[in-house]
Amino acid sequence: MDIRLELLKSEDEEQFIRDNQAAFNYGAEQYFTDEELKEQYEEEGQIISRETIVSSIHRKGSIAYRIIEGDKKVGGIIINLKNTFGDLEIFFVVPNSESKGVGQAAWREVEKLHPEIKVWETVTPYFEKRNIHFYVNKLGFHIIGFYNEFNKDIQIPEEMDGMFRFQKKTGQ
């Protein structure tokens, strides 16, 4: 499998956003009825809003990559780096390319490109069992928190309700 990462080009940003939304919608559609799905939307018809993606792409310290297989765009990753800490903000594989090792190969590339990062963190919603499996069993992350009505904290934003937080230490 020929997987590589390319920096997101400004002329591809709009398609990146659409692909990201399609992938996140696809994941949620596997778990919710149409009525339940509406309760999960950040914006009309979208699990992840355009604003969330755009702000992640353009946040200080962020790097956005396209995941490329051969000559085809099959996903995307947005990371935010600060010294030896990395925040995996967005990670998606387009629906027809999932479950083929694309995500694992892409993550290996991220770690190769950023060996200075010693601790990675990310979050995913409770209903995304495939993501939880992927982060824990395939990439070696550990669950370090579950934010819900029983684990409220003024420092945890309301939109984190129902989210697992993961961490991966890559070195000392």
Predicted regions located by residue number:
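Conserved acetyl-CoA-binding loop-helix of GNAT-fold acetyltransferases
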Residues: 93, 99-112, 137
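Conserved GNAT-fold acetyl-CoA-binding loop/helix
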Residues: 24-53, 62
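A conserved beta-turn-beta hairpin within the catalytic core of GNAT-like acetyltransferases
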Residues: 81-89, 98, 116
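Conserved catalytic-core motifs of GNAT/GCN5-like acyltransferases
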Residues: 123-127, 132, 136-163
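Conserved GNAT acetyl-CoA-binding A-motif
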Residues: 113-126
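Conserved beta-strand in the GNAT
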Residues: 64-66, 72-80, 87-92
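Hydrophobic adenine-recognition pocket in adenosine-nucleotide-binding enzymes
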Residues: 8, 91-93, 124
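A short beta-loop-alpha structural element at the N-terminal edge
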Residues: 4-31
